[in-house]
């Protein structure tokens, strides 16, 4: 089978969030299973010259964008065994950053149409186009509307992965007419119409052959009013077309046994003393009292309501009366940034607020923390809890989305489980869960068992890639 993976960003070329990590790691894992998958993405001007100088120009053609024909070049680079195609157009992509421009509707209309046109020109007989989030969700629509006559296109199946339903690519209806060249019939409730505008993501949900969210629980949540972002009715109505496949993490990148960014390397057999050394050195680095009796709770997160910072604000005064240190890394809403800075100033022996992002400090927090906090309001999948488990930091999570699917709550009677969880978005429940985790921490045998279970869970991309391979096979056999 031949899969074209269409995405707006991919590590290490362009990254603004977790989508880029998926676009690098999932194709790599699928190729290890023997799937011929290739990635296609925009050639942004921010891509490092170390990569652009190695790209090979393979073809160029014009792409219809409304009444105009725009130049499109295709460049190629193989990275870690994965072929990448880059869509080159300086008018749309020679700018700082990736998103947030007034003409994003036009930019990603062009990119989506360019992917469709590229099928004519690539030496690659595409069976499935795998699209991701709103940026490429209009590709299945375009295939049905404009390419039904093409022998190269009419056999192509499509799969859409929704990484976060909140971002839907909502644009004025003129984008549909003037840029996508779609007739009036597409501006209807059963097609692209979303209130008085159009939604790229809605089009992808309707016209793709399969829809995947990034966890089983999130696949159920998005069918409800609370999580459906206005599309719950549509998602409830597509039945088994919608499934959930949990994301993984790259075990070569996130490996405490080889990670050069942490103080001391360790694995699931040697963590007990070596992880403690990471904790002590992190405490020293952040000017916190060095002690193993004090529980170091880590958090690497955007500082937003969605990530549960509101709950932390509600309990922080009570939390700081307990034998804990709170180490937070991230940036976000000004209110939360200032709140954490104030507590770090008032309680310098208890709180370290690092209002920035540093991959090196993030790794040191994963390796040096005893517990890892993710009290999210919403979390489609969540990657941080998987990294924390890999590094032996026991997650405390709210039971939502991928957090519910990946963190099994510890049962002190059976000894099973590798984390702690609470159900409702409620500060009292979060505080009670932290207190319970602290009581278990004091029993070193129980805690050692929990950490070992967390570190030995398989959250690599292997299982996820196998699930996607099965979906691809089912589409080709349908």
Curated annotation (Swiss-Prot):
Keyword terms: Glycogen biosynthesis, Glycosyltransferase, Transferase
Assigned EC number: 2.4.1.21
One GO biological process term: glycogen biosynthetic process
InterPro entries hit by this protein: Glyco_trans_1, GS/SS, Starch_synth_cat_dom
UniProt-listed Pfam families: Glyco_transf_5, Glycos_transf_1
The keyword Transferase is assigned to this record: yes
Annotated pathway: Glycan biosynthesis; glycogen biosynthesis
Binding site for ADP-alpha-D-glucose: 15
Top-level taxon in the UniProt lineage: Bacteria
GO molecular function, one term: alpha-1,4-glucan glucosyltransferase (ADP-glucose donor) activity
Catalytic reaction annotation: [(1->4)-alpha-D-glucosyl](n) + ADP-alpha-D-glucose = [(1->4)-alpha-D-glucosyl](n+1) + ADP + H(+)
HAMAP family tied to this protein: Glycogen_synth (MF_00484)
NCBIfam families assigned to the protein according to its UniProt record, in alphabetical order: glgA (TIGR02095), PRK00654.1-1 (NF001898)
Family of the protein in this entry: Belongs to the glycosyltransferase 1 family. Bacterial/plant glycogen synthase subfamily.
Biological function: Synthesizes alpha-1,4-glucan chains using ADP-glucose.
Name the UniProt record assigns to this protein: Glycogen synthase
């Amino acid at each position: 089978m031949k899969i074209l993976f269409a995405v707006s960003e991919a590590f290490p070329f362009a990254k603004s969030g977790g989508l880029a990590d998926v676009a690098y790691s999932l194709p790599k894992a699928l190729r290890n299973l023997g799937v011929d998958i290739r990635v296609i993405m925009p050639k942004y001007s921010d891509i490092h010259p170390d990569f652009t100088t190695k790209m090979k120009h393979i073809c160029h053609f014009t792409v219809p964008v409304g009444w105009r024909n725009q130049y499109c070049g295709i460049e190629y680079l193989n990275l870690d065994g994965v072929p990448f195609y880059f869509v080159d157009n300086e008018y749309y992509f020679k700018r700082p950053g990736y998103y947030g421009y007034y003409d994003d509707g036009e930019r990603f209309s062009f990119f989506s149409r360019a992917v469709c046109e590229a099928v004519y020109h690539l030496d690659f007989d595409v069976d499935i186009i795998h699209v991701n989030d709103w940026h490429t969700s209009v590709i299945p629509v375009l295939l049905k509307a404009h390419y039904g006559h093409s022998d190269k296109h009419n056999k192509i199946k499509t799969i859409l992965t929704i990484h976060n339903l909140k971002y839907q690519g909502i644009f004025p209806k003129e984008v549909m007419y003037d840029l996508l060249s779609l007739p009036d019939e597409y501006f209807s409730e059963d097609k692209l119409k979303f209130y008085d505008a159009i939604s790229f993501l809605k089009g992808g949900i309707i016209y793709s052959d399969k829809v995947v969210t990034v966890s089983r629980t999130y696949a159920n949540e998005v069918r409800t009013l609370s999580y459906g972002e206005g599309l719950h009715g549509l998602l409830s109505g597509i039945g088994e077309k919608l499934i959930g496949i949990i994301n993984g993490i790259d075990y070569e990148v996130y490996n405490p046994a080889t990670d050069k960014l942490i103080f001391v390397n360790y694995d699931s057999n040697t963590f007990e003393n070596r992880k403690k050394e990471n904790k002590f050195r992190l405490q020293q680095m952040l000017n916190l009292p060095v002690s193993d009796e004090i529980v170091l709770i880590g958090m690497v997160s955007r500082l937003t309501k969605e990530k549960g910072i509101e709950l932390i604000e509600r309990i922080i005064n009570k939390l700081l009366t307990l034998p804990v240190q709170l180490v937070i890394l991230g940036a976000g809403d000004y209110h939360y940034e200032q709140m954490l800075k104030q507590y770090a100033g008032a309680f310098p022996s208890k709180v370290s607020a690092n209002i920035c992002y540093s991959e090196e400090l993030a790794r040191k927090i994963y390796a040096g923390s005893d517990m890892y906090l993710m009290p999210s309001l919403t979390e489609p999948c969540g990657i941080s809890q998987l990294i924390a488990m890999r590094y032996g930091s026991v997650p405390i999570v709210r039971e939502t989305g991928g957090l519910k699917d990946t963190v099994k709550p510890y049962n002190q009677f059976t000894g099973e489980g590798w984390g702690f969880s609470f159900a409702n978005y409620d500060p009292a429940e979060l505080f009670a869960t932290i207190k319970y985790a602290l009581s278990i921490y004091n029993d070193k045998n129980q805690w050692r068992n929990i950490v070992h279970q967390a570190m030995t869970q398989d959250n690599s991309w292997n299982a996820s890639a196998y699930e996607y391979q099965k979906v691809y096979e089912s589409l080709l056999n349908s």
